[in-house]
């Protein structure tokens, strides 16, 4: 099921999702839904003991994003807001949980990972709706790396170019599966920023495309192609 007035922004770390989310929401008179990091009670403990807190870190993120998703969909349906533009949808959470599971140190055990996926499925099957349009911002990993450096977030300093390359591969797989299920995907090359009026025009154009939604899709259940080599890299993987 789709929610009219719900636009998702997807893409790797550093591509520019937050900036587009805010600018696009302002242009459409929608509400911007940004990622929240400061309120995570597991964050500090996770960085001290990733294996001990990896599972609960992901469960907290899933629960937080689920509550956020349910609230804004309800507000749209009741006419309290025109719509939302969301920086990283709940559908992408499974990408990062899976990376922790496939880490050489098994930062999330197979048992915990499967329990997490069951929890995700139960939430999705009962409550969640797909965005009207999912905008995928596509850029080279090298470009994303440069942008990460420019914004200077301390917790992102352990991110490597190899990680960004593999993350991009996982995102490409995610987008292909979502598109195969009939979700409208607006793929934008984000090597350079596109003017907001042009993005708005493309959104209106894609909104007229018929939906071919045929089945429920559970993104990214296949084994990942990347095994982070160090615990330091894993800090970056679970962060965003």
Q: Where do the model's predicted regions map?
A:
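Hydrophobic positions on the alpha1 helix immediately C-terminal to the Walker A/P-loop
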Residues: 20, 24
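A basic- and aromatic-enriched beta-loop-alpha substructure that forms the phosphate/nucleotide-
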Residues: 64-111, 135
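Conserved substrate/cofactor phosphate-moiety recognition/catalytic segment
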Residues: 26-64
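P-loop (Walker A) phosphate-binding loop of NTP-binding proteins
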Residues: 12
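NTP-dependent small-molecule kinase module
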Residues: 145-240
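Hydrophobic anchor at the beta1->P-loop junction of P-loop NTPases
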Residues: 9
